[in-house]
Amino acid sequence: MLIFQAFIQSPGETFLNLGFLTIRWYGFLISVSVIIGLFVSKKLAKARNINPLYISEILPSLIIFSIIGARAYYVIFEWRQYSGENLFTSLELFNNTIQIPSFLAVWEGGIAIHGGLIGGLLSIIYFCKSKNIHLKTFIDILIPSIILGQSIGRWGNFFNNEAFGVPTNLPWKLFIPIQNRPLEFINYEFFHPTFLYESLWNFLIFILLIFVFNKQNKTDFFRPGFISCLYLISYSFGRFWIEGLRTDPLCIGGLPPFCSGGIRMAQFISIFLFSSGLIGIFFLRLRTYSCKNRKNG
């Protein structure tokens, strides 16, 4: 009897070692996401008769605020990892080793997408007000690139051996080195590749959003803001399920891996965002009907 056995294994966190400078996969993937996102957003901006240069203008502040928000969100809920003996970490730069506060070491992993969304949204709101751009239309232009960036960025978790799920023996199981396993699962070798689940789910959302974007000017059903609401609904739906598999959740009133006695923060936020998306679509439809009634009246 032939038994198929296979598993996924990270080759390591280093993408390129130049001797004087080490480039990690996490940073490389973020850079790739930014470049692709810039290209996609400019294309979508042209389709809505919005100056593509606005995308280039907002990019620096969007990146900075998103990273700050994502890191701050994670550090706040995982402060025990960045305090006491872990307050500082080593950074090799030009053949020198320096000590920096560990909460600044974003390249080592430890960011939360919900925090990044909050930071990015604040940047977008300020930019749209300063440029007098329609907020909902501009967010609809950026959202497809954001979810595509999330899809690409999730692979950073793979290379860092982090954000994996509970033990499994499925054919697509992920091997995790013993030093990266939670104490509760120290004797298990294979885990759910939740990074892969979320990456694939996010890419499907990207395709859906692009489809809706191309239909947006052809029907009143997809008003400005619809794509943003659809993103909140679809992403939150998938994230809620995937989060339930993970062994490293940010917890409220509990401890990983199962947040016993508490709740998983990402699932709580997902419920809120899912509901917000539904409410948003309801009001968009209500406004559409109101406009039609005024025209017919």
From Swiss-Prot:
Binding residue positions for a 1,2-diacyl-sn-glycero-3-phospho-(1'-sn-glycerol): R154
BP GO annotations: lipoprotein biosynthetic process
The keyword Aminoacyl-tRNA synthetase belongs to this UniProt entry's keyword annotation: no
Secretion signal, residue range per the UniProt entry: none
GO molecular function: phosphatidylglycerol-prolipoprotein diacylglyceryl transferase activity
Entry keyword set: Cell inner membrane, Cell membrane, Membrane, Transferase, Transmembrane, Transmembrane helix
E.C. code: 2.5.1.145
Principal location listed in the UniProt entry: membrane
Pathway: Protein modification; lipoprotein biosynthesis (diacylglyceryl transfer)
Transport found in the keyword field: no
Sequence intervals crossing the membrane: 20-40, 50-70, 105-125, 133-153, 193-213, 225-245, 266-286
Source domain of life: Bacteria
InterPro entries for the chain: Lgt (IPR001640)
Location(s) in or outside the cell: Cell inner membrane
Membrane topology: Multi-pass membrane protein
Pfam families: LGT
One term under GO cellular component: plasma membrane
Function: Catalyzes the transfer of the diacylglyceryl group from phosphatidylglycerol to the sulfhydryl group of the N-terminal cysteine of a prolipoprotein, the first step in the formation of mature lipoproteins.
Protein family membership: Belongs to the Lgt family.
NCBIfam families in alphabetical order: lgt (TIGR00544)
Protein's name according to its UniProt entry: Phosphatidylglycerol--prolipoprotein diacylglyceryl transferase
Protein species of origin: Prochlorococcus marinus (strain MIT 9312)
Gene: lgt
